[in-house]
């Protein structure tokens, strides 16, 4: 039944609290899955107090159970364990809190845990979070390495010592986090995101020295996997558990089998790089020496040729041939010029014989009127008309006295 209230007639707090308590009470017993975040056993009390945390969201709820139920659990219930409870929810109106009273507690077995992790893996893989094309290469020599690990842990010591042994100048920015237990996933997420925001950090290493499947459950937390998928900085997972890798190994850009292996992956070995430089220098020196020797041999071969040993020998061998060719060219040119001169004289004689001047020299003349037109007929000249006569060596000016027309056939 809905609670009736309005601005004019608001419901008091007690009424709201009692209504919520009634709704929760009518809910009945429920099966609840979660991770035990805290266990508190108070001396003299027959009740054990637990805190149950959601596996994905940052939500927790207090749980109570009888000491008899708690002590009868096998294996014993410890913090970080995954459980399924059959519990009756209760709402305490005076405090405004919700709690569960557990009537049955079942430990989640390893097989069931692995099956759930596999279903989660398939779901995240279907979203593309583990795609190979998303993997980013690690920088060759990072300026600063971000390290997420537990304080004073063997994993921290292994990463720092091995990295500095390989490259003494490497710098680390360490973000400590719980690497086991109910707070582990949220603290690792916070540490990774803080390092990702640091512009000096070029690669992040999440390191832990192995552990059981239950111990490594935080590194398969869905919220952690999605957080690592979102960051921009390359990340190396160094959880160190070969048989059943946590999902962090799949979303990380590089997986290292151990923290020591992670140190070898994120920084180069200065001694090995120095050896590589020496080997490269020796290879370059050898290649240069071989090239110089090859070119020197070719130059020596050219120098040993007779033509290069005494260049005048080649000129002397060709001198007589050049002289002969020059004489032959001169003779051929002389003959050609003589023939050309004869041809020119012949053509000149023919031209002279055929020219009008030669005709005039044989006694012929050309008669022209006063306008310079050649007179070819007696009809073109009138008596007493001025005319000129062109002869071989000059011109005669005359005046016609009369004309006479001749018969051409008789002429």
UniProtKB/Swiss-Prot annotation:
Subcellular location: Cytoplasm
Catalytic activity, reaction form: Exonucleolytic cleavage in either 5'- to 3'- or 3'- to 5'-direction to yield nucleoside 5'-phosphates
EC number: 3.1.11.6
Taxonomy, superkingdom: Bacteria
Keywords attached to this entry: Cytoplasm, Exonuclease, Hydrolase, Nuclease
GO cellular component, one term: cytoplasm
Gene Ontology MF terms: exodeoxyribonuclease VII activity; nucleic acid binding
Predominant place of localization: cytoplasm
GO biological process: DNA catabolic process
Keyword Cytoplasm: yes
Keyword Cytoplasm: yes
Role this protein plays: Bidirectionally degrades single-stranded DNA into large acid-insoluble oligonucleotides, which are then degraded further into small acid-soluble oligonucleotides.
Quaternary context: Heterooligomer composed of large and small subunits.
Family membership noted in the UniProt record: Belongs to the XseA family.
HAMAP family xrefs: Exonuc_7_L
Protein name (Swiss-Prot/TrEMBL): Exodeoxyribonuclease 7 large subunit
Organism: Nocardioides sp. (strain ATCC BAA-499 / JS614)
């Amino acid at each position: 039944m809905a609670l009736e209230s309005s601005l004019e007639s608001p419901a008091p707090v007690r009424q709201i609290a009692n209504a919520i308590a009634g709704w929760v009470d009518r809910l009945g017993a429920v099966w609840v899955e979660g991770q035990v975040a805290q266990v508190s056993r108070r001396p003299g009390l027959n009740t054990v107090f637990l805190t149950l945390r959601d596996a994905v969201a940052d939500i927790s709820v207090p749980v109570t159970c009888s000491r008899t139920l708690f002590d009868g659990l096998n294996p014993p219930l410890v913090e970080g364990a995954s459980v399924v409870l059959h519990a009756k929810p209760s709402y305490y109106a005076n405090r405004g809190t919700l709690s569960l009273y557990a009537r049955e507690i079942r430990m989640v077995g390893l097989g069931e845990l692995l099956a759930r992790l596999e279903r989660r893996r398939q779901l995240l893989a279907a979203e593309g979070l583990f795609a190979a094309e998303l993997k980013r290469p690690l920088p060759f020599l990072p300026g600063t390495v971000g390290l997420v690990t537990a304080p004073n842990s063997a994993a921290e010591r292994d990463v720092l010592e091995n990295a500095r042994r390989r490259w003494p100048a490497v710098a680390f920015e360490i973000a400590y986090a719980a690497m086991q237990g109910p707070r582990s996933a949220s603290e690792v997420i916070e540490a990774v995101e803080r390092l990702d925001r640091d512009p000096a950090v070029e690669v992040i290493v999440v390191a832990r020295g192995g552990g059981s499947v239950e111990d490594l459950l935080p590194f398969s937390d869905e919220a952690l996997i999605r957080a690592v998928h979102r960051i921009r900085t390359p990340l190396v997972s160094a959880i160190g558990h070969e048989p059943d890798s946590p999902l962090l190994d799949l979303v990380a850009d590089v997986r290292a089998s151990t923290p020591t292996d992670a140190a070898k992956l994120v920084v180069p070995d200065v001694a090995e790089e120095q050896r590589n430089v020496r080997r490269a220098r020796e290879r370059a020196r050898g290649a240069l020496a071989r090239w110089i020797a090859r070119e020197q041999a070719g130059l020596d071969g050219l120098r040993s040729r007779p033509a290069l040993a005494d260049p005048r020998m080649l000129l002397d061998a060709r001198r007589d041939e050049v002289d002969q060719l020059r004489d032959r060219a001169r003779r051929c040119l002389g003959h050609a010029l003589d023939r050309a001169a004869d041809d020119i004289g012949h053509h000149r004689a023919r031209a002279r014989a055929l020219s009008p001047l030669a005709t005039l020299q044989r006694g012929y003349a050309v008669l022209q009127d006063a306008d310079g037109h050649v007179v070819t007929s007696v009809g073109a000249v009138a008596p007493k008309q001025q005319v000129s006569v062109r002869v071989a060596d000059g011109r005669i000016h005359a005046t016609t006295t009369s004309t006479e027309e001749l018969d051409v056939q008789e002429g």
